[in-house]
Amino acid sequence: MHLLRTQPGGFVPDDGIAHLAQTPAELVILCSGDSHLALLAEAARALPDDYPSLRLANPMQLQNHASVDLYVEEVLRHARVILLSLHGGIGYWRYGVEQLVALAERGALLIPVPGDDRPDPELSALGNLPAEQAERFWQYLRQGGLENAGQFYRCLASQCLGRDYAWREPQALPRVALFHPRHAEATLEHWRADWQAGRPVVALLFYRTHLQAANTAFIARFCERLAAQGLNPLPIALASLKESACLAQVEDWLERSDAALIVNTTGFAQSNPEAPELRPFRRDVPVLQAICSLDNRPLWLDNPQGLGPRDLAMHVALPELDGRIVTRPISFKGLAWRSERSESDVVCYLADDERMDFVAELARRWAELARKPNAEKRVALVLANYPTRDGRIGNGVGLDTPAAALNILRALRQQGYPVDGLPASGTELIRQLLGGVSNDLEHLDLRPCAQSLALDDYLACFARLPERNRQAVLARWGEPQQDPMFRDGRMMVAGLRYGLTFVGIQPARGYQLDPAAVYHDPDLVPPHGYLAFYFWLRHAYRADALLHVGKHGNLEWLPGKGVGLSAECWPDALLGPLPNIYPFIVNDPGEGAQAKRRTQAVIIDHLMPPLTRAESYGPLRDLERLADEFYDASLLDPRRAEQLRGEILVLLRDNRLDREIGLQLSDDPDSWLPQLDAYLCDLKESQIRDGLHVFGESPSGRLRLDTLLALLRVPRGDGKGANAGLLKSLADDLGLGFDPLACDMGEAWQGARPACLEERGGEPWRTLGDTRERLELLALHWIERCLGGESPPATWRASGEVLRGLCEQVAPTLDACGGAEIDGLLAALEGRFVPAGPSGAPSRGRLDVLPTGRNFFSVDVRNLPTPTAWRIGFQSANLLLERHLQEHGDHLRQLGLSVWGTATMRTGGDDIAQALALLGVRPVWQAGSQRVADFEILPVSLLDRPRVDVTLRVSGFFRDAFANLIRLFDAAVQAVAELDEAEELNPLAARVRLERQRLEAQGTAPAEARRQAGWRIFGAKPGAYGAGVQGAIEERLWETRADLAEVYLNWGGYAYGAADDGTPARERFAQRLERLQAVLHNQDNREHDLLDSNDYYQFQGGMLAAVETLRGAPVASYHGDHSQPDNPRIRTLKEELNRVVRARAVNPKWIAGMKRHGYKGAFELAATVDYLCAFDATSELIDDHQYALLADAYLLDAETREFVRQHNPQALRDMAERLVEAQRRGLWQEPGAYREALENLLLDVEEE
């Protein structure tokens, strides 16, 4: 060990001996709270020169035995009196407490007191001062303030050191009080005297402890910065917003001051997550969360994540439960001054002027939204555009973004905003936008531009960027005149104004300007054209607020800190302190949280698309009919049965369904027909989307009924009464004796056949799948009848309760969503409070997320993985291991798993729980709080199988939001790696030993070799996001699968763990992937699928491409279906892709739903083609006939082709190009006549 001088803030960066460099003194005061130390150091300034010698220290700086022993030897053994103020109890500093007790036994006076407001009898009993006197010293510290601190010293000298000092008893400070830097007992009148008439009042809430610690300089400074922005500050010190008396007084001051806004610096949450509809404050004003960071400023500047885990929980995640708008850190703990008298560094909260100015300006802009007439407000709607093609404008997952934008514009016009000349439809809106410049470089020079920024104005804005940002842009992109958006001395901006309201196309990220950057530059800085767009919005257009419409744009994913951004972070530098309002799908808390935390967004959550059953169509329906006829004929007409068997075989082979299903066809149909039955039933009952959501509209008619059934299908909450699943309740009421959500669909039905089910459907009733279908139809029938005022049969007790819940709660909340979405958006634009609400997938039992229109929050990361997630993860892990053993004849030992932050938030940590279960490790939760406190290693004898060596590839948002889970999993990995178990039972330990030996043989130091050998968590470069594969595919910057593997490795080759925060580790990442036997990704809901998003092919497809390229051989790939929490399923990735193509992608029902949405519907068809081709490029799992199915359904079907041509002709070209490209690359290996048909179609489209 080596001696190490401690850093301000008590942070000891390694296990060296902390040396406080203090000399002996009569009185030593140890406080685990920096606020107490700062107060006592400040009060010590006023002590007379002859006061006993004094030392102040933080025991948390002395974290190991050697550090404690050194301090005892140098300081404590010489002290006459030792006072210890310890927060959290003896367990937080046990060895140190033991040494203090030993000193007391040798004659020192020991006064241990709690470090907070709660008595600690165990700690207090260790002292040797009478309890009454010890209690008094605790009260001095507990009440705080300079007066009490001064009396504390006087009392200590008098009572414990034999000095002649008069002293007074501790005086209680108010639990809530106004603060004024010039008045000891501030009043509202004191502040009124300072305020400027007509300015909005901003209440500034801060902890009473700052007042108690005399650490108010940063609060006074923030008041000055607020005033500089034209605001009247009203600082309020309080103990806790959860204390009713404190809250009542705060409410009173808010009303009396007519506060326009609240800036809150207190941590945690005021609201109850179970009742988020209860507003934190009665006053209908926004609440901004300003962060008083527990870290020091240099640590924050150097940390690519920004805030540490404690700050993330206290000042970000938990305040989001209250609907607070997350802003920036305004102060940091730091060395304020050196107390020579106590030989201690005084650590206080220090103001950060630049970040304070950001928050103050943001506060002013929110206050202005409430004061400015709507007719004078300038609002800009921003539509995302990626890929950067004209057929893909208006990204918004599950959202008809053009129609949503039009609904928003209409609502604004109705409320008196300056909106004029609106188009008749969303499709027409896009057509008008494409009359001007866009991100499409091919036609850029041929189109007019409706607004632009003069080069001189651009350069003036550019000059205001931080130096590092300016240099990065110039080094990467050169001068702005070289940018494609530069024309005739101006920087062009894509979009149109409707009246004074702007609709713009968000600029491209930059990879289309330099496609090769996708291989080596995951944190690419945005180009000049990107900067010009946001410069124009802020400084030329002078927007009062931005609306980024739909999940999601690219602003919140630009390089920079994960949370607690600095001025050099790109989202901060470009958006600045502008109000950002973000309509966002309710089932994606993770990516919504990214926008909230990096672009101060207020989320207005919206519904997922209407949901429905896939049902049967085309050859699937024909097969179902033939199978039914075969079973009937096999009993009555064997010759007819044989003929039907032949027809079934022909139909199966013609449609390649035998390969999709994996049927082993033989002369005995009994060996494969049940499997066919099960497959057809599974497809028919699959949940798919029926169209898209339109912001501001709830589903109606059939869409409403189908969606309600989807919401009632699985249990909610406790699964009892009205929360039970409707299908299972019907099955129970009818005495069917099975669970329709967890059955073998192909198994013969031997149960009862109630008349009410006999009436449903005209098809034969043979299998459990047929019974499930009849229950679905019965449920839909009674949903409609109950909503029409009828009551179900009195004997239906279980389903009757569910249907009553439907009428009383579920249907009304669904119906309320459309109006609530518009109301929430208008409230935000009027500078009012948008209530918080939970987030999640409604069809997975999360009906508490309805109605939408709220500013959703995510989860308390300290509680993850939850016990429910552990149950699901453990069950899914076992299913995976069983499936692999069954198919490969040996246990799975090496697995790669992709883990996303948004899925972790939705599920409470299914994926991490599954990874821990595979390792053979179980979380340990604290009693009462349910926070994860530790883990325990399960013995191999209990597992009854080998442990699995799991390698994680985490998303960038997971890295930013779940540092605690990274540390938990890393700790579990290292613990398992140290077990003394046989290689065949613990492949992780064996591999770590082998890698360590290899690295040491190459000259790596033993400790470093062990660290690298234990790396099992990899992700993107700090500050960067994504897997990179999309860029390579979109820009067609690849030739072989190995090229895509290279991109995946380059983007993901950074190691994370307790001792690593993005350490470059590409070689180790490749070595890990080369060892894998299988690749897994889980999906937690059915409100989307694998061909709906680029993320699935980037993460799982990319990993599979890398693994198989490195190994030179195929490996297993699995898809975990966690959409029904009580019934997780494991399929191969190929099986899941097959299901998605049949159930959704080429399903006429889904295509018809898209046709209701014009431009965006055609966009969705093109996206499906893109994602299918990309999945094949990465995974090589798409068959030729599946390309043909999409070509037939989208391009060669005359009606669908004409729909696309009319509404989104660019999408028609994009689809034809992509399928022709698939043929050229050999993905679609034998296209036959499709080659000529598609090439001719492409020529026709290009001519048009």
Swiss-Prot record:
Enzyme Commission number(s): 6.6.1.2
Cross-referenced Pfam families: CobN-Mg_chel
Keywords for this protein: ATP-binding, Cobalamin biosynthesis, Cytoplasm, Ligase, Nucleotide-binding, Porphyrin biosynthesis
Top-level EC class as recorded in UniProt: ligase
Cellular localization per UniProt: Cytoplasm
A molecular function (GO) term: cobaltochelatase activity
One Gene Ontology cellular component: cytoplasm
UniProt keyword annotation of Ligase present: yes
CDD domains assigned: CobN_like
Pathway of action: Cofactor biosynthesis; adenosylcobalamin biosynthesis; cob(II)yrinate a,c-diamide from precorrin-2 (aerobic route): step 10/10
The keyword Nucleotide-binding belongs to this UniProt entry's keyword annotation: yes
Catalysed reactions listed for this entry: hydrogenobyrinate a,c-diamide + Co(2+) + ATP + H2O = cob(II)yrinate a,c diamide + ADP + phosphate + 5 H(+)
Domain of life: Bacteria
Assembly, per entry: Heterotrimer of CobN, CobS and CobT.
Family: Belongs to the CobN family.
The protein's name: Aerobic cobaltochelatase subunit CobN
Organism whose genome encodes this protein: Pseudomonas aeruginosa (strain ATCC 15692 / DSM 22644 / CIP 104116 / JCM 14847 / LMG 12228 / 1C / PRS 101 / PAO1)
